[in-house]
Amino acid sequence: MNTASFQLTDKITLGDGHEIDPGVILGYLTGRDIADVALSIGSGARIRSGTVIYAGSTIGLGLETGHNVVIREENTIGDHFNIWNNSTIDYGCTIGDNVKVHCNVYIAQFTTLEDDVFIAPGVMIVNDPHPICGFCMRGPTIKRGARIGVNVTLMSHITIGEGALIGAGSVVTHDIHPHSVAYGNPARPVKYVDELLCPFDLVDRPYVDGLDVKARQAGIRRRL
């Protein structure tokens, strides 16, 4: 028997072809006063046990979650969004199409992830330069196709440029130019992604050849 919990049933819209595990909560009511408590999830969703999706968000086609995922209210999320185990999207975020958020990630309020962004495990995204103050909260903007490595911390009010790559363990405190490779604490750009070579000789330049393949696959998914 499916023991998923649907709160505010009349305000939840689920597209066709969804698969929802027992132990999922949809339409969880926030304690905040929000304008619209409707929850809309597009067709083809795969929502695994332990996931909690709050009332008041819009999510596109092909959502897939791992276990123990939290997606809070007032989020606008595009098609084919993947988010894996123990990750949290706080409220007020904007997320594009074909975005992947890996395990144990925290994405703070008012963060923007554009299309085709990849967030590796353990990434922490923050939004407040003056903790507890609350007057100037704004998360980073991560531009289309940028990739954030394992255990990176992204500070508030910054922009990660289109196609940029942030190395594992970095702390990013300022804007990163498009297509740059940056790492360190604080992270600094060291080269461009099209200069990187594949150490295994699988492709010549992984962030040129490899991304071309990925883009074609994403285009096929959109047409389907």
What are the language-model segments listed below?
Residues 178-203:
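Conserved beta-strand-loop-alpha-helix hinge in the C-terminal portion
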Residues 43-45, 144-146, 200-203, 209-211:
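Short, low-complexity, polar/charged sequence segments that are solvent-exposed and flexible
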Residues 204-224:
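ABC ATPase nucleotide-binding domains
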Residues 4, 10, 16, 21-22, ...:
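Left-handed beta-helix
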Residues 11, 100, 143, 191, ...:
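Context-gated lysine
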Residues 17, 195-197, 210:
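Intrinsic-disorder/low-complexity loop/linker signature
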Residues 1-3, 209:
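Membrane-proximal basic amphipathic "stem/tether" segments
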Residues 32-34:
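N-terminal glycine-rich cofactor-binding segment
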